[in-house]
């Protein structure tokens, strides 16, 4: 039995609250159960120096956790003068995931930065950041389309979402919360498109190695969860 009493293939309650920032071109507060992430998408009408005069745009991401997003207060990374390795890894993952469904040439020489700030953490913050970050990115593109800067259908090739899976107490399960993640024998994150294309898989055996059969079961669970997340994204942005 999972600590949350969910079925192995049951996700937490998922919600998207759009338009939570009056300043950002796109914004979304995404909730995966008790994990809450604020995602804002900001437009800059310029690109990094290495993309100037290329005709291509850029989508990037930044990620951070508020000091009291966890059970005990975390020191702000700004106070230590540098970002931690985990932070850098996650924000690069979010950026790669969002770029996988963007036509950078159709975007033109503009940059969109998606900021993902964890307000409350209970496992799966990176997957929530990707899934909610897409909604914020979509709304930013819609804002641009309303001003005749882009056409959303040309820039946006597909949806993208992410979910965690793992083996808990010998059973493959979907969408781990912190209690499950901290005790899981295997922990994995899957990023996939709405059409089922695989963008990235991160998997680690925390205890004994997992088998190929167990991996395929985790992939099956992830695909089911991501297709549901994409349905919820489409409902949110419609």
UniProtKB/Swiss-Prot annotation:
NCBIfam families in alphabetical order: RNasePH (TIGR01966)
Report the source organism. Chelativorans sp. (strain BNC1)
Q: List the disulfide bonds.
A: none
Database matches in PROSITE patterns: RIBONUCLEASE_PH
**Name of the molecule in the record:** Ribonuclease PH
What the entry lists under CDD domains is as follows:
RNase_PH_bact
Q: Which UniProt keywords apply?
A: Nucleotidyltransferase, RNA-binding, rRNA processing, Transferase, tRNA processing, tRNA-binding
**Record InterPro entries:** ExoRNase_PH_dom1, ExoRNase_PH_dom2, ExoRNase_PH_dom2_sf, PNPase/RNase_PH_dom_sf, Ribosomal_Su5_D2-typ_SF, RNase_PH, RNase_PH_bac-type, RNase_PH_CS
> Subunit structure, briefly?
Homohexameric ring arranged as a trimer of dimers.
Q: GO biological process annotations for this chain's record?
A: rRNA catabolic process; rRNA processing; tRNA processing
**Pfam hit, one:** RNase_PH
């Amino acid at each position: 039995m999972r600590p949350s009493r969910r079925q192995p293939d049951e996700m937490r309650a998922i919600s998207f609250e759009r338009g939570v920032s009056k300043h950002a071109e796109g914004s979304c507060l995404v909730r995966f159960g008790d994990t809450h992430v604020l995602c804002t998408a900001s437009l800059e009408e310029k690109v990094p120096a290495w993309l100037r005069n290329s005709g291509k745009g850029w989508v990037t991401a930044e990620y951070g956790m508020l000091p009291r997003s966890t059970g005990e207060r975390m020191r702000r990374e700004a106070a230590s003068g540098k970002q931690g390795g985990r932070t850098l890894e996650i924000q690069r993952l979010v950026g790669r995931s969002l770029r996988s469904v963007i036509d950078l040439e159709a975007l033109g020489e503009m940059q969109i930065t998606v900021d993902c700030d964890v307000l409350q953490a209970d496992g799966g913050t990176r997957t929530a950041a990707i899934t909610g970050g897409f909604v914020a990115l979509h709304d930013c593109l819609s804002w641009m389309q309303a001003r005749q800067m882009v056409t959303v259908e040309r820039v946006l090739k597909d949806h993208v979402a992410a979910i965690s899976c793992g083996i808990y107490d010998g059973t493959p399960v979907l969408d781990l919360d912190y209690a499950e993640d901290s005790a899981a024998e295997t922990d994995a994150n899957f990023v996939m498109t709405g059409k089922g294309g695989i963008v990235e898989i991160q998997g680690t055996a925390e205890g004994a190695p997992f088998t190929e059969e167990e991996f395929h079961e985790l992939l099956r669970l992830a695909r089911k969860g991501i297709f549901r997340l994409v349905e919820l994204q489409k409902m949110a942005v419609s």
